[in-house]
């Protein structure tokens, strides 16, 4: 099987980001964004998606969390796009429902080459551990755009920590499922068009 890894850096006046991604890893992760709860969520994504991930971001957290979260999403999405490559042999579609106590997240993904993001629901509290809750949805919108995937997500619950964590775990599981190689179509692109 081809090596499905990528390394992406992004440096702006607002952030300095470095990301590595191995789609065929075992969930190893090293994450440091300066936002503890966001680090925890990225670790959950890696662990439950079985991706080896490193993320380092030095951002303008004295302003707020927006630039850090968004730029990590840009870099991780770009790394995903590079790592998945021509998408030959992948399952392409996947869906997961993941609970965390009273909260449940629903995730549907199509590794289609088309950037679409839809989010249904909301978060029960405005912030969790230094992360503005709505930035969790914005992170996945940014990821979907730069990964060129279709991603439909929804959350329901009473505790924003649980809602956001279920969402990150759900995306990890769904993306892992969608990028798994189906030996019956190894080497083929999963599209009647022949290209994605």
UniProtKB/Swiss-Prot annotation:
GO terms for molecular function: imidazoleglycerol-phosphate dehydratase activity. Transmembrane segments: none annotated. Pfam families: IGPD. GO terms for cellular component: cytoplasm. The keyword Repressor does not apply. Its EC number is 4.2.1.19. Its main location: cytoplasm. The keyword Plastid does not apply. Belongs to the imidazoleglycerol-phosphate dehydratase family. This is Imidazoleglycerol-phosphate dehydratase. It comes from Halobacterium salinarum (strain ATCC 700922 / JCM 11081 / NRC-1). The gene is hisB.
């Amino acid at each position: 099987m081809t090596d499905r890894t990528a390394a992406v850096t992004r440096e702006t006046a607002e952030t300095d980001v470095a990301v590595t991604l191995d789609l065929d890893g075992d969930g190893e992760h090293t994450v440091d964004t300066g936002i503890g709860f966001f680090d925890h969520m990225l670790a959950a994504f890696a662990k439950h998606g079985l991706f080896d991930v490193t993320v380092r971001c030095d951002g303008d957290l004295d302003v707020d969390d927006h630039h850090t979260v968004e730029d990590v999403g840009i870099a991780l999405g770009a790394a995903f796009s590079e790592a998945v490559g021509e998408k030959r042999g992948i399952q392409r579609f996947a869906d997961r429902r993941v609970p965390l106590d009273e909260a449940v997240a629903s995730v549907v993904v199509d590794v289609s080459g088309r950037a679409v993001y839809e989010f249904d629901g909301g978060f029960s509290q405005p912030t969790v551990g230094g992360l503005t809750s709505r930035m969790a949805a914005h992170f996945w919108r940014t990821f979907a755009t730069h990964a060129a995937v279709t991603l439909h997500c929804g959350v329901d619950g009473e505790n924003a920590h649980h809602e956001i964590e279920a969402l990150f775990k759900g995306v990890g599981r769904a993306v892992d499922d969608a990028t798994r190689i189906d030996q019956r179509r190894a080497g083929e692109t999963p599209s009647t068009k022949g290209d994605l």
